[in-house]
Amino acid sequence: MVALTRRQREMYDFLCSFTDSHGYSPSFEEIAEGMGLSSLATVHKHIGNLESKGLLKRDYNRARSIEVLRPKGQLKKSMAAAAAVATAGLPFLGRIAAGQPIEAIENPETISLGDFTGSKEVFVLQVSGESMQDEHIVDGDYVLVERINTARDGEIVVALVENSDTTLKRIYREGETVRLQPSNAKMQPIRVPAGSVQVQGRVIGVLRKY
C-alpha cells in the first residue's frame, strides 16, 4: 500500500470497516462523527488525499458514492466472513412434520449457506422496525442480501434514498418516480424521484434467532 499519514490510515480503515459492515459508504457527516472530527472541511481534505493516492473513487453526482479501492489480494472483511459462513456446514437431520410424524434420517447430510447463496456476493443486515412484517420479516431478523445495483419491480431490496438512510422495501418503478412499498398496512409507501434512489442489494433469505 502507498504511504499514508496516521490520520489517513485511520480514515481509510474507518471507511473499509463502515462499508463492510453496512454494505454502503458513509456520508461525510458520518465520517466526521465516527472519526471525532468537528469540521467537514477536514473530512474533505483527507478524502481528497486518499483519492489522489488511488485508494478511493467517487462519483460526484451521487450521494454516498465513496468506493474504497483495496490493494490486490486484500479481501473485504464482510466477504471473508461470508465465505467462512458459507463453507461452515450444519447437520441436516431430515424433515419435520407439522402433521403426522415422519421417519428420521439415520445418515445426516450437511447443509451450508453456500448451498443457498451460490457464487453471489452476499452480506447480512439486521432488520430494525416492523415495516416488512407482512412478509414475515420482523424487527431483529437478519436478511441475506445479494449485492446488486438493480432489481425487478416487486423485489425486496435494500434501497438508499438520497439525503436519507437505507430502507428495506419492495421496489416499484412508476414513470419518473419510485415507490418503496412497506409490507405493513399501518405504514405508507415512500415515493421519491427515480434518480434519488440507489439499489444496494436484494433480499435472498431471512435468518431468525429465537
Curated annotation (Swiss-Prot):
Enzyme class: hydrolase
Reaction catalysed by this enzyme: Hydrolysis of Ala-|-Gly bond in repressor LexA
SUPFAM superfamilies: LexA/Signal peptidase (SSF51306), Winged helix' DNA-binding domain (SSF46785)
InterPro entries on file: LexA, LexA-like, LexA/Signal_pep-like_sf, LexA_DNA-bd_dom, LexA_repressor, Peptidase_S24_LexA, Peptidase_S24_S26A/B/C, WH-like_DNA-bd_sf
Keyword Transport among UniProt keywords: no
Pfam families: LexA_DNA_bind, Peptidase_S24
DNA-binding interval(s): 28-48
NCBIfam families xref list: lexA
Free-text function comment from the UniProt entry: Represses a number of genes involved in the response to DNA damage (SOS response), including recA and lexA. In the presence of single-stranded DNA, RecA interacts with LexA causing an autocatalytic cleavage which disrupts the DNA-binding part of LexA, leading to derepression of the SOS regulon and eventually DNA repair.
HAMAP family, per database record: LexA (MF_00015)
Sequence similarity: Belongs to the peptidase S24 family.
Subunit structure of this chain's protein: Homodimer.
Name the UniProt record assigns to this protein: LexA repressor
Species whose genome carries this gene: Koribacter versatilis (strain Ellin345)
Phylogenetic lineage: Bacteria, Pseudomonadati, Acidobacteriota, Terriglobia, Terriglobales
